[in-house]
């Protein structure tokens, strides 16, 4: 009887070990990807990413109907970007109709992410954190809600070439309702 108990325990343990092994094999690619995304960028690598925005751009934006936009609206504007402060920060000036905004982007070595501050001519400002995806040549920004209203936001910038950026902006309230949707195309001039 004791021998049978050991055999059953061994078989059960073996199945558990196999299940754990299969689970580990399935989880490794996810952990590996997370590790790669969390790797530190060198100062030169961060500089190379920041220079992708540098220069003068013309933009065409489509604001889709949402809570913050009563109807679909198309706008045009221009953007001028320059590296500042020993090439550690990117200063972006956005001119769109009567609105002007200044964005500051930098790479934070401590958090292994990019930081983005946006200051608008109406006095409002926003803060975003970003991760660079080298494979897709895209930057994904996540909105940080200091107001605690439960607003979430994402900006996905896809660098289609050295001369074109396609951007999608989505902001939602805590229930998931769309507050803002923007599709933007920027072309270097």
What are these regions (language model features)?
Residues 40-41, 58-90, 97, 178:
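Short, solvent-exposed loop/hinge segments that bridge or flank secondary-structure elements
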Residues 1-41:
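Bacterial Sec-dependent N-terminal signal peptides
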Residues 97-126:
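Helix-adjacent hinge/juxtasegments
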Residues 77-82, 102-106, 127-132, 152-159, ...:
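Hydrophobic/aromatic beta-strand elements that line small-molecule binding cavities or substrate pockets
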Residues 91-96, 116-119, 140-146, 168-171:
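Short beta-strand segments that buttress and anchor functional surface loops
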Residues 133-153:
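Acidic, glycine-rich flexible loop segments
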Residues 41-58:
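N-terminal helix-cap/turn-to-beta initiation motif at the start of protein domains
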Residues 39, 164-166, 170-189:
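Edge beta-strand at a domain terminus
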